[in-house]
Swiss-Prot record:
Topology of the protein relative to the lipid bilayer: Peripheral membrane protein
Quaternary data: Heterodimer of a large membrane-associated beta subunit and a small pyruvoyl-containing alpha subunit.
Residues recorded as bearing Pyruvic acid (Ser) in the entry: 188
EC number(s) on file: 4.1.1.65
Job description of the protein: Catalyzes the formation of phosphatidylethanolamine (PtdEtn) from phosphatidylserine (PtdSer).
Domain of life (superkingdom): Bacteria
Pathway: Phospholipid metabolism; phosphatidylethanolamine biosynthesis; phosphatidylethanolamine from CDP-diacylglycerol: step 2/2
Residues the record marks as site: Cleavage (non-hydrolytic): 187-188
Record's protein name: Phosphatidylserine decarboxylase proenzyme
Organism listed in the record: Rickettsia canadensis (strain McKiel)
Database matches in NCBIfam families: PRK05305.1-1 (NF003677), PRK05305.1-2 (NF003678), PRK05305.1-3 (NF003679), PRK05305.2-1 (NF003681), PRK05305.2-5 (NF003685)
UniProt main location, coarse: membrane
GO annotation, cellular component aspect: plasma membrane
Length: 231
């Protein structure tokens, strides 16, 4: 039974209905036409691949902010936080991570701390790689306070293909770095907002691994010492 449980753990639950549907259609197609059946099974395999949910080795240190998503850093710029969070016109550093359809789409908590506020904002579905996606696209914004007292924001943004954002967090949740908290289906973007004086450890064009890549270090003046924990 443990092996079956392990199998389901490596696939995000949001994928179960898609995988089952693709598999059923594939069997039906195969009963009529072998080639169509093969195409269906290839699509099913891709669906399993898309919803994969691998463990990661998360760096454990209260000063660190880790990437909430797999992808490529599309942009790093000074920007105002999402207006729906009510933080006013205090500029922050925005690190934008673009996910293509081949990336792992499970999202992870970027730091230890407490969830202060969440806000879902319905919107449009522009290409997530465009700068205006941060403003106009459907998004789920999360404000948290880290254990070090720093306020940071992470935002799930739907893209041209992505049409569903899943966020399992609630206001008041105590969270740990690297914990899974949601998923965006089929191509998307995740923005991370940090205080202006934060020491960044990434650059534009860099590939990130959700739960592993260190984006920033609030204790950069100290000697960085941390361990890793599998999650």
């Amino acid at each position: 039974m443990k092996h079956y449980n392990d199998l389901f753990k490596i696939i995000h639950r949001e994928g179960y209905i898609f995988i089952a549907s693709f598999a059923l259609v594939s069997f039906l197609l195969a009963s009529f036409n072998t080639k169509l059946g093969c195409i269906g099974f290839i699509a099913t395999a891709w669906c399993i691949y898309f919803f994969r949910n691998p463990d990661r080795y998360v760096p454990i240190n209260d000063d660190l902010v880790i990437s909430p998503a797999d992808g490529v850093i599309q942009e790093i710029k000074e920007a105002l936080p999402p207006p729906e969070l009510g933080l006013g016109d205090v500029a922050m550093i925005r690190v934008s991570i673009f996910l293509n359809i081949f990336n792992v789409h499970v999202n992870r908590i970027p730091a230890n701390g407490k969830i202060l506020a969440l806000h879902y904002n319905p919107g449009k579905f522009f290409n997530a790689s465009l700068d205006k996606a941060s403003i106009y696209n459907e998004r789920q914004s999360v404000l948290m306070e880290t254990d070090q007292g720093q306020k940071i924001i992470f935002v799930q943004i739907a893209g041209l293909i992505a049409r569903r954002i899943i966020c399992d967090l609630e206001e008041g949740n105590e969270v740990k770095t690297g914990e899974r908290y949601g998923i965006i289906r089929f191509g998307s973007r995740v923005d991370v907002y940090l205080p202006l004086k934060t020491a960044l450890l990434v650059s534009k064009g860099q590939t990130t691994i959700g739960g592993e890549t260190i984006i920033a270090d609030f204790g950069r003046k100290k000697t960085a010492q941390f361990k890793f924990k599998r999650k």
